[in-house]
Amino acid sequence: MTLSLNDIKRVAKLARIEISETDAQQNLVRLSGIFDLIEQMRAVDTQGIKPMSHSQDMVQRLREDIVTESDQRTLFQSVAPQIEDGYYLVPKVIE
């Protein structure tokens, strides 16, 4: 895909970004490089290659889904300045 200076200016205008001529030229060079890289990646033959979600083919060891800590809400709320119905009461900060 080829990109022109007018394309850069048009996108900047649509995004309501003020862009100088120098910045437009620099962005043109950078974006053209990105598009060239994308074209190179699209040209790679991937037929017969199995898609993968991770670079290392290994199984992650997971722990059992069991409760390991007890409920300490009563202990924590015993030192709170104010609580009501199990909730912490805090000063109002937004009017």
From Swiss-Prot:
SUPFAM superfamilies: Glu-tRNAGln amidotransferase C subunit. Coiled coil: none annotated. Its EC number is 6.3.5.-. It comes from the Bacteria. One of its GO terms (molecular function) is ATP binding. Pfam families: GatC. One of its GO terms (biological process) is regulation of translational fidelity. It catalyses: L-glutamyl-tRNA(Gln) + L-glutamine + ATP + H2O = L-glutaminyl-tRNA(Gln) + L-glutamate + ADP + phosphate + H(+); L-aspartyl-tRNA(Asn) + L-glutamine + ATP + H2O = L-asparaginyl-tRNA(Asn) + L-glutamate + ADP + phosphate + 2 H(+). Keywords: ATP-binding, Ligase, Nucleotide-binding, Protein biosynthesis. It is an enzyme of class 6 (ligase). Gene3D superfamilies: Glu-tRNAGln amidotransferase C subunit, N-terminal domain (1.10.20.60). HAMAP family: GatC (MF_00122). Belongs to the GatC family. Heterotrimer of A, B and C subunits. Allows the formation of correctly charged Asn-tRNA(Asn) or Gln-tRNA(Gln) through the transamidation of misacylated Asp-tRNA(Asn) or Glu-tRNA(Gln) in organisms which lack either or both of asparaginyl-tRNA or glutaminyl-tRNA synthetases. The reaction takes place in the presence of glutamine and ATP through an activated phospho-Asp-tRNA(Asn) or phospho-Glu-tRNA(Gln). This is Aspartyl/glutamyl-tRNA(Asn/Gln) amidotransferase subunit C. It comes from Nitrosomonas europaea (strain ATCC 19718 / CIP 103999 / KCTC 2705 / NBRC 14298). The gene is gatC.
